[in-house]
Amino acid sequence: MAVKSIKVKLRLDDMPEIRAGLWKLHKEVNAGVRYYTEWLSLLRQENLYRRSPNGDGEQECDKTAEECKAELLERLRARQVENGHRGPAGSDDELLQLARQLYELLVPQAIGAKGDAQQIARKFLSPLADKDAVGGLGIAKAGNKPRWVRMREAGEPGWEEEKEKAETRKSADRTADVLRALADFGLKPLMRVYTDSEMSSVEWKPLRKGQAVRTWDRDMFQQAIERMMSWESWNQRVGQEYAKLVEQKNRFEQKNFVGQEHLVHLVNQLQQDMKEASPGLESKEQTAHYVTGRALRGSDKVFEKWGKLAPDAPFDLYDAEIKNVQRRNTRRFGSHDLFAKLAEPEYQALWREDASFLTRYAVYNSILRKLNHAKMFATFTLPDATAHPIWTRFDKLGGNLHQYTFLFNEFGERRHAIRFHKLLKVENGVAREVDDVTVPISMSEQLDNLLPRDPNEPIALYFRDYGAEQHFTGEFGGAKIQCRRDQLAHMHRRRGARDVYLNVSVRVQSQSEARGERRPPYAAVFRLVGDNHRAFVHFDKLSDYLAEHPDDGKLGSEGLLSGLRVMSVDLGLRTSASISVFRVARKDELKPNSKGRVPFFFPIKGNDNLVAVHERSQLLKLPGETESKDLRAIREERQRTLRQLRTQLAYLRLLVRCGSEDVGRRERSWAKLIEQPVDAANHMTPDWREAFENELQKLKSLHGICSDKEWMDAVYESVRRVWRHMGKQVRDWRKDVRSGERPKIRGYAKDVVGGNSIEQIEYLERQYKFLKSWSFFGKVSGQVIRAEKGSRFAITLREHIDHAKEDRLKKLADRIIMEALGYVYALDERGKGKWVAKYPPCQLILLEELSEYQFNNDRPPSENNQLMQWSHRGVFQELINQAQVHDLLVGTMYAAFSSRFDARTGAPGIRCRRVPARCTQEHNPEPFPWWLNKFVVEHTLDACPLRADDLIPTGEGEIFVSPFSAEEGDFHQIHADLNAAQNLQQRLWSDFDISQIRLRCDWGEVDGELVLIPRLTGKRTADSYSNKVFYTNTGVTYYERERGKKRRKVFAQEKLSEEEAELLVEADEAREKSVVLMRDPSGIINRGNWTRQKEFWSMVNQRIEGYLVKQIRSRVPLQDSACENTGDI
């Protein structure tokens, strides 16, 4: 069954004694779970680690194993005395060994086994807390009969085998032995239950006859076991991941730095020098001074230019080459400070001896950085009612715990209530346990989807969903009482919780479950593998399935058993998602339309008579992603305001560095500051720019003629004055942002400025980052300002961002589900919207698998990073949760290079941006975007005959351009995200493998000839290339041939994680030990031959870029064009 969670607010304004009782119950439950967790942690007898109180993310030992053993022995000896034991007390080692055995029974995850916390809690709590309990000893006659007994009584065959299995399990179970040993040593009972201990201040109701422990204690004990089980599993995973990183580090060192120990020592010395020169780096993280790939961007060009200079050449010559490269690649350039250090004679060996060394060491540093952040042990945290709360649980009617009942319309229409069968009530300062408390709940639209099903069965209900024509059957599940976490920190100021909620779970049956089926029938056609649900098709089952379930075109969810359709989804940034729907059909159904065009389709592997026919493709837009002139103006204005403040802060930070004690750093910063035209970027407010320029003029008059102390004091005073000036701007900006209009979103068609778009979330993130940088800005070079422990800096904005992300994920997942079911959101004549069935439904939703995006030249890194951070993972999980009740399958497909090849032709291409209309106007006050200005300058388009919507190849953008044929000027254009969605379909139906377009090869010798040997990183690659090698005559194009009958085994690197494999690949590529080959399946680029990756994409770029440039140059130049404006943004 699918589980839905509905959070309702309890109306407690007129029930102060119940409000206080709920808060008291919350504290008691947390204290009780803490009590039992402490017992379990002592029985474990191993080190416990907590977060360091310094707030630096490090760990420290909270309690050593010896301290745990000492405290445990103290408790055990005290228990023997309290129990009046007069028999053998046992040695310390015997008691500790017995305690550990008990722990492994309670928490089997400690020894790598599995167990059910509910069953363990019910099995052990009574024997451990009641001296008369006989549970677990194998002699109790109460409880359910064994399964083999029930089978024998029912006359079912196989009961003898089941009995044998039960006896085998019983003989292997050490429970009885451990419990008897505890009794022999006078340790029964081992502990008092929490509700009977001196720690509890509640007047609990007396136990019923035959009741050994209260349900409150049973749930507390169960939650403590659940926490320890989860913690033990996590602790093992953390240790394994740490060991893997250590092994990865050692393997990388052995493979890359043997024989270069002197260079390793030198680069460590370089990093130490940079650390000492910039103490502020350590305020971010301990590895902030490490050499990174980002800091080395452009190093190949810089080192090439430097190689022509003498080692003892003046620094000015080296610095000039740095600036030349930086000027040509402003957005693809690394750290000027790092290059300046590398130009010093003592560090030149790092790039003169081996130009690839620093690149490889940057990869190595990425491993060290992960190792530095990794933990060897999981952090152990005890429950706390305010800091680390757990929630009080209730069971449905008829359950094993304290129960609740949902009362429909108890106080009128839509005015529901909750009846708690047991609760606490505080009167005159005394908390007492009471029975049957009815609490009204606030109205909620979510509750309107619940309808009572049977008055004789209070837990039975109907669940209404807009994605189904009929109601789903369901039942109430468990529930939790929850408080708002932001209010818990202030509970010491009040006696009770302010806002209290009940989180109710509802178990809903899908259509297939209602028919008595475990899965829908089409689930047999697809295979979903692993946690990522990688999708594969059982091609041999397609024909039989379609014969049993012919396509009759039913619309909406009623058509799920009609035909077979797949909807692929490409998540984007500009629009939330792009979808493409394909239907499995017979090939003879493909009929040309009135224009003679055959429908777009993909062949299906192994099925000559079946094809996947394209039905529809479209963009899914959420509120905030629609475009209009007015909306764009508002969005650009608020971005421009924030961009001005960020630019001013960047200049202010550069001015601070001009006052550094390090002379070299100071002079480089000063040179950089005065060389940059302050007003050219047009990213500052005029008044602040004027104030800043005035301070620069004052400093220019002092530079070079005053002492270091006077210069640093002058810089500090200048910083302080412009910082104060900017402070007023920041305050005014914050005031405007807080008072800005926030339009309410209803439906999917409303135009709003922000809405649920990623652009809006990124804008909020940039606000937060700017405020953080501004609040912790140091006015003295090297000054480090950190947030105080427990700081709630910009907590409201942070919560707003988190809620915006959660809201986007849920809305996007809901929209994808409805689109897959064939529903569209339509407005009636009154403007009221509702979901209407318009298309036949899809049985499978296919997402791109982004976790394997390890290739540097695939999707733009910035775009992939934004999707990976939270959006894709969150949508995937939310889709799985929502799709289950609708019987929809959710899978993923290998997505590497799906945005770089045309789905129709297979040809590679480039993503392009359109020229903005404003850049073609006669009098354009705004500068060109940086990408357009770069294109114009590179191709010397002085006359700039640009038109609106001209395509500019940038590698980013929403238009994908690829060659359509080998003929010159024959190109295909399509929306890039729609193309990526269609590529996922092509890969699904063709059983795609990456080796069809990309191969990693190593240099080697075969029969005395230097050849490329394919790296067999998987079974598919091994099947195709285990006995093949590649040779070349040009060093660019490679041809394959067989190397003999002997087939090689799969490459050992298959055992590595894909991330580690790609790290090793990057290092090999830097040393030219391996080569990546690409090919064009369409045969257009280099006739479809295998080509070195760099040259392959160069051929693609030259072909498309040349065509687009030729188109622009073929026009009549526009006179006095505004295109001479070459500003940059």
From Swiss-Prot:
Its cofactor is a divalent metal cation. It is an enzyme of class 3 (hydrolase). Changing R1015A: Dramatically reduces cleavage of target DNA. It comes from the Bacteria. Residues 573-574, 897-900 are annotated as: Binds non-target ssDNA. Residues 387-518 are annotated as: WED-II (OBD-II) domain. Residues 1-14 are annotated as: WED-I (OBD-I) domain. Its EC number is 3.1.-.-. Optimal in vitro activity occurs in the presence of Mg(2+), but there is weak activity in its absence. A more complete study shows a preference for Mn(2+), although activity is seen with Mg(2+) and Ca(2+) also. Residues 975-993 are annotated as: RuvC-III domain. This is CRISPR-associated endonuclease Cas12b.
